[in-house]
Amino acid sequence: LLCAALILGCAAPEKKTQEPTPQPEREDENGLAFAALSVINMREDPNYAAELGTQALMGTPVKVHAHDNGYWVNIETPDGYKAWVNEMAIVPIDQARLDAWKASKRMVVTNYYTFFLDAPRPDANHVSDGVWGDIVEYVGATGKYTEVALPDGKHAFVPTADVTELRSWVDSRKAVIPANAPQSDVEKARQLILETAKTFVGVPYLWAGTSIKGVDCSGFAKTVYFLNGYMLLRNASQQFKTGEPVDVSEGLGNLQPADLVFFGREATEEKPEKITHVAIYLGDGKIIHSSQLVRINSLI
C-alpha cells in the first residue's frame, strides 16, 4: 500500500538525523516500560532544553536502555526511535507483565480527545486525558462508561463512545492486506487512510508531534497510518525508503490516493539526495500535509 514519489520543491526542513547523546550513568539494556501519559515527549538529550525528537502514545511498550541522574530515561519505541523521557512519563514493567498485557482485552481511544475519570459520571474528577490511539486495558462496563486500567495500574472510567476494543478496531482497519487480496480491500484501506487524514485538518504543526494535539509532516503521515494499523518509521527520510517507488517524472498520473509524496532535492555530483517534507496524496492533484497546520493543497 505504501508508495513513494519524489517531487522537487521547498518545504519545512525535515527533522535532523539523531546524534549521539551523552554517556549515561547507568545502563539498563533489558528494561521494559509503558508510556504512561496520553502523549509522552521524547527528547534528544536528557534535559528539558533539548530538542523534542518524537512522541509516544499511552500504552506504547518501549525498551529501556539507560538512566541519567535518576531522572531521565533513554527509551526505544517499537519503530526503533531512541530518545530521553522524564522518568514520570513511563511505568517500568517486566516481561511477564508485557505478556499479560498482550493477552488481555485492550481498548483503544477512538475519539479525538477524552478524559479518564475517577467515577462513571461526567462531573467526576479527571485522572488523565486521553487522545486518539491511546491503549488501555479493559476492566468492565458501567452504563455509559467503560472501566479501564491505565498503564500505571490506576483504574478509571471513560465514556464508552470514546473507546473501541483493540482487536476489533484493528480488524476494521484492514491492517493486514495479503498480496492476493481483492482490489476492493485495497481500495477500502486507502479510503480509511484518507478519511483519517482529513480529520486532522486544522490541527497545528508541532515539531516532532505524533498525536491529534499537534503533528509535524512525518509525524502526521506516521500517525495517520498508525491509526489504520500500519507502523511507519519516524522521519520523512526513513519513510521515503519504505514501500515501492512511484514514477512521477511525467506527471502525477501514477499516484494513487493514500500514497506518500515526498519533497526534496535530487542527488547531484556535488550534493546527496535530501528529503525535506512528506505529504499524503488525496487524488486529483491534491495533497494533505502538516505545514503550519494540517491543510489540503494542490500540486497542479
Which residues are covered by each model-predicted region?
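Loop/turn positions that initiate beta-strands
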Residues: 59, 130-136, 258
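Second-shell loop/turn segments in exported
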Residues: 123, 178-184, 204-212, 268
